[in-house]
Every structure is written in structure tokens, then in C-alpha cells.
């Protein structure tokens, strides 16, 4: 078999819940100062789920929508891997649930499984897919990588940093968005900055200050190791000057702003005599670990990077601000935000990427956009879908999270949330039996059903219009469910 070239992303899709809470509303509800969440964290809205949605249903929606929008033949997929830390079952993987989308088409020969380490699982799943395609085990088929989570926190200062969403990516050779082979910097260590030892709760245990220290230390190491790989491959020094765009794992947007400054700080340490860094002279001989919480340095870096942040990073932040932290999906929702914002202007551009998962695992790597990607942007239709969401009052948001809390790990029940506000065609949890087996159904509208049927069967709009809508809807539901 011919060695595949230009491996990368052919299609990308995100599924997010149809409900969200505005951070400005949460500020009032929580009785905190105006701007604490919107300015202090840099967040706008936060997606959330009630008891009708879980990581299985979100992932089913992301993969099903990806396959539908990009006309993916289920039998063309040879690897399916999921990165998530939202664990429903200590044994059964999310990937096995997703197999329902393929087995009904006769494809049960699909490699891959779930990958778990906090927010890093999606990146590990992605790298596994790339390495599979580069190996002797590759069978010529494409891969789908799934990355996402439902991020919830108990009442308190961390709750506004939650979120929900799942990204699915179609990976294959000769892609418009390619990975720069051999360019990666990795850092991993054993630390308890964020972890979930209690299987009876969705809530994590978090040492916030330690986690920020770990995040910055990981950036320092990954960035410099990526720089060395770049210099080895291209024979020239690396700095942010070689980067057209930069995207980051985003627990909250303010940390992304600081992280971009952190990369420039490393450029300064690597080239302290550059006149652009004159205001940082006092930090020339200071240990990096002593600067993590230095407010004077932070302000200086913010001033130096202000313009570059606006052009290189801000275009990646839409979904992070609108959905909140999607954990494993965070980095790739940033990529999708960038595609939506810049479209074909990205052709020929390098996108430096930093992915972080507590515990910890992190890496820096890069994409290059080799071909026009406006067709991807049009199919995802991101901003229109965001605009169709339902804004929910903080009181209702709090009730929904309380409901999730009481029903976590519960058996023998039927979820009580309404499905009327869900996006048409969405999978949702319909019941959990006394053995803990979960059942799913789908929401439908006439237009959504007929639209999906038309795409699946490749029949004309005029033919659709000639059908009796009620009869057509009833008849095609059975086809779409097969």
C-alpha cells in the first residue's frame, strides 16, 4: 500500500446542547461583582445539559452529524477513537456505544477505543489516529476522532468555568488541514492539580493555583521542545514570528491570554537581547517557575502581545467563550472557531496548538492549511447554530445541575427534562433500566427528517415536495433509524 501523505482533517463538526446560561446573568445570580466572570474569566456564555443528555448522546450527535454533513460512508472508517474524561461506566467505553452508527451498515471492523487523561484524551486519540495511518497496520480507510466532555462543578467559584460540547473530526490522507510531521513537544508528569477520585460524583477536586502552575510549566516545556523540533526539521530558529495563529486548551479565556504571553516570555529567554523585549530585562536571570504569578511580568507580556493576540489568538476563541470549557473538546473547538472566522484566508498558514490535561499530560504541535476550507465552514454553519440556542435563567440552570447531581449513577428511571428545545434530530437519553443499561431515542421535525432523508437517498427537493409530509415523515423515520 502506498504510504499516505498530507494526513489531516477532511471534516470537523461540533455538537453542543441547545441551552446555555449567560455569564452576566450568573454574576447577578451569584451576587459577585459585575465583570467577575465576563471580564475576570473572559467568558460570555456557558452550555449545559439536563438529565436528557450525557456523553453518549453528545458523542452520537457529533459523529452522526459529521457523517451526514460530510457524506461519510460508514464502511470507509477503519478507526474510531474517543477522548473524554466524562465517565459513565468504569468498563464500557463511549466508542462501543458509537458502534451503533456503523454496525447497522455492516461495519464492525473499526479499531480504536477511549483515551482518558483529563482534558488531554482528545489530543491523544488524534495522535493515535495519525500514527495508525503512518504505520504498517493502516488498511487504507479513514479515521474519526471524537473529543469532548460535560464539564460541571459544584456550587462555588469554579462553577462558571464549566461547559459542554463534543467535537468530531474526519481524518485521512490528502487533507486540506494537515499536521506538520515530526513537529511536537511533549511534557508529562505526576501531579494532583485536578482529579476525580469519587465515582459517585461528576465533580472534580481542584487545586486551582497548582493547576495554573502546572499549565504554565507545561507550556514552557512543550513550547521549547517544539522549537527544538522545528529547528531540527527546518534548520532555523523558532519563535512566535513563525506562527500565523495559535490556539490553546481553554479552561477560561483569560488563561488563554496569559498563555500566549507565556510563549513570548520563552522567546525572550531564548533571545534576551532582542530590542522588542527591552521591558522584560529585569526577568533575564529569574527562574521561570518564580514568574508564574508575577503580576508585573503579566502586565508587561500583555502589553507586548496585545496586537498579536488580537490577530493570532482571538479568532480561535469563539466557541470557548460561547460554550465554556469542553475539556477534551476545548482545543479542537478552538480550531473550528478559527476555521469559521478566517475560512480560506487560512490557506498557507501555520497554526501552533497547545493541548493540556491535568495530572498531567501536554503537547505542542502544529497544523497547516493546504487547501481551501470554505466548504467545511459552510457545512458546519457554526454561528447560525449558536444563534438558535435557548438562553436559560440561572435559577433553571442551577435546578438542572442539581437534577444531574441527584441522578448521577441512578438506575431504573426515565429522565424528566423536556426534549422540545433540543435541536431536531438529536439523540437523547430515553431511559436507564434497573441493570444500568441506557436507551436512546431521537428528536425529529418534519423538515429535519425530510432533509436528512434527501441527503441520505440523494433525491431531489421537488420529489420531497411532492410527497405528503405526514406520510413521508412517518415512512422515512424507519429508514433513518436503521
Curated annotation (Swiss-Prot):
Keywords: Lipid biosynthesis, Lipid metabolism, Steroid biosynthesis, Steroid metabolism, Sterol biosynthesis, Sterol metabolism, Transferase. Condenses acetyl-CoA with acetoacetyl-CoA to form HMG-CoA, which is the substrate for HMG-CoA reductase. The active site is at 85 (proton donor/acceptor), 119 (acyl-thioester intermediate), 249 (proton donor/acceptor). Its EC number is 2.3.3.10. Pathway: Metabolic intermediate biosynthesis; (R)-mevalonate biosynthesis; (R)-mevalonate from acetyl-CoA: step 2/3. This is Hydroxymethylglutaryl-CoA synthase A. Signal peptide: none annotated. The keyword Translocase does not apply. Coiled coil: none annotated. It catalyses: acetoacetyl-CoA + acetyl-CoA + H2O = (3S)-3-hydroxy-3-methylglutaryl-CoA + CoA + H(+). InterPro entries: HMG_CoA_synt_C_dom, HMG_CoA_synth_N, HMG_CoA_synthase_euk, Thiolase-like. Belongs to the thiolase-like superfamily. HMG-CoA synthase family. The keyword DNA repair does not apply. It comes from the Eukaryota. CDD domains: init_cond_enzymes. (3S)-3-hydroxy-3-methylglutaryl-CoA binds at residues 119, 161, 211, 249, 258, 325, 358. Pfam families: HMG_CoA_synt_C (PF08540), HMG_CoA_synt_N (PF01154). One of its GO terms (molecular function) is hydroxymethylglutaryl-CoA synthase activity. One of its GO terms (biological process) is acetyl-CoA metabolic process. PANTHER family: 3-HYDROXY-3-METHYLGLUTARYL COENZYME A SYNTHASE, HYDROXYMETHYLGLUTARYL-COA SYNTHASE A.
Amino acid at each position: 500500500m502506498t504510504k499516505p501523505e498530507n494526513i489531516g482533517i477532511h471534516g470537523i463538526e461540533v455538537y453542543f446542547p441547545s441551552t446555555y446560561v449567560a455569564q452576566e446573568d450568573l454574576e447577578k445570580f451569584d451576587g459577585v461583582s459585575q465583570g467577575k466572570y465576563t471580564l475576570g474569566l473572559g467568558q460570555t456564555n456557558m452550555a449545559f445539559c439536563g438529565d436528557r443528555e450525557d456523553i453518549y448522546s453528545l458523542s452520537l450527535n457529533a459523529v452522526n452529524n459529521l457523517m451526514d454533513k460530510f457524506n461519510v460512508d460508514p464502511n470507509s472508517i477503519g478507526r474510531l477513537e474517543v477522548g473524554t474524561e466524562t465517565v459513565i461506566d468504569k468498563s464500557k467505553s463511549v466508542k462501543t456505544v458509537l458502534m451503533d452508527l456503523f454496525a447497522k451498515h455492516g461495519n464492525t471492523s473499526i479499531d480504536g477505543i477511549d483515551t482518558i487523561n483529563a482534558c488531554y484524551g482528545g489530543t491523544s486519540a488524534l495522535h493515535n489516529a495519525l500514527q495508525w495511518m503512518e504505520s504498517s497496520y493502516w488498511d487504507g480507510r479513514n479515521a474519526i476522532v471524537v473529543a469532548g466532555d460535560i464539564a460541571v462543578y459544584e456550587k462555588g467559584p469554579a462553577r462558571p468555568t464549566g461547559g459542554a460540547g463534543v467535537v468530531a473530526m474526519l481524518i485521512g490522507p490528502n487533507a486540506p488541514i494537515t499536521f506538520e510531521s515530526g513537529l511536537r513537544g511533549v511534557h508529562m508528569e505526576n501531579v494532583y492539580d485536578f482529579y476525580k477520585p469519587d465515582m459517585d460524583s461528576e465533580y472534580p477536586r481542584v487545586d486551582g493555583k497548582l493547576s495554573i502552575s502546572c499549565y504554565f510549566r507545561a507550556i514552557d516545556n512543550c513550547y521549547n521542545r517544539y522549537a527544538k523540533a522545528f529547528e531540527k526539521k527546518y534548520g532555523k530558529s523558532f519563535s512566535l514570528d513563525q506562527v500565523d495563529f495559535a490556539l490553546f486548551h481553554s479552561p477560561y479565556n483569560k488563561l488563554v491570554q496569559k498563555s500566549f504571553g507565556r510563549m513570548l516570555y520563552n522567546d525572550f529567554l531564548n533571545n534576551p537581547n532582542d530590542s522588542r523585549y527591552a521591558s522584560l530585562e529585569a526577568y533575564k536571570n529569574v527562574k521561570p517557575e518564580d514568574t508564574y504569578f508575577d503580576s508585573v511580568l503579566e502586565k508587561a507580556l500583555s502589553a507586548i502581545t496585545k496586537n498579536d493576540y488580537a490577530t493570532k489568538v482571538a479568532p480561535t476563541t469563539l466557541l470557548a467563550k460561547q460554550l465554556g470549557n469542553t475539556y477534551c473538546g476545548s482545543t479542537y473547538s478552538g480550531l473550528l472557531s478559527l476555521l469559521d472566522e478566517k475560512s480560506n484566508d487560512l490557506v498557507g498558514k501555520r497554526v501552533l496548538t497547545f493541548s493540556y490535561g491535568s495530572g498531567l499530560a501536554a503537547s505542542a504541535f502544529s497544523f497547516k492549511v493546504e487547501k481551501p476550507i470554505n466548504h467545511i465552514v459552510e457545512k458546519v454553519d457554526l454561528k447560525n447554530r449558536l444563534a438558535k440556542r435557548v438562553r436559560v435563567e440561572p435559577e433553571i440552570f442551577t435546578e438542572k445541575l442539581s437534577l444531574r447531581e441527584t441522578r448521577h449513577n441512578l438506575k431504573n428511571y426515565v429522565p424528566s427534562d423536556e426534549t422540545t428545545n433540543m435541536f431536531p434530530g438529536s439523540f437523547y437519553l430515553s431511559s436507564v433500566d434497573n441493570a444500568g443499561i441506557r436507551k436512546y431515542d431521537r428528536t425529529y421535525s418534519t423538515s429535519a427528517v425530510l432533509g436528512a432523508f434527501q441527503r441520505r437517498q440523494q433525491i431531489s427537493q421537488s420529489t420531497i415536495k411532492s410527497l405528503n409530509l405526514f406520510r413521508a415523515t412517518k415512512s422515512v423515520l424507519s429508514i433513518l433509524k436503521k
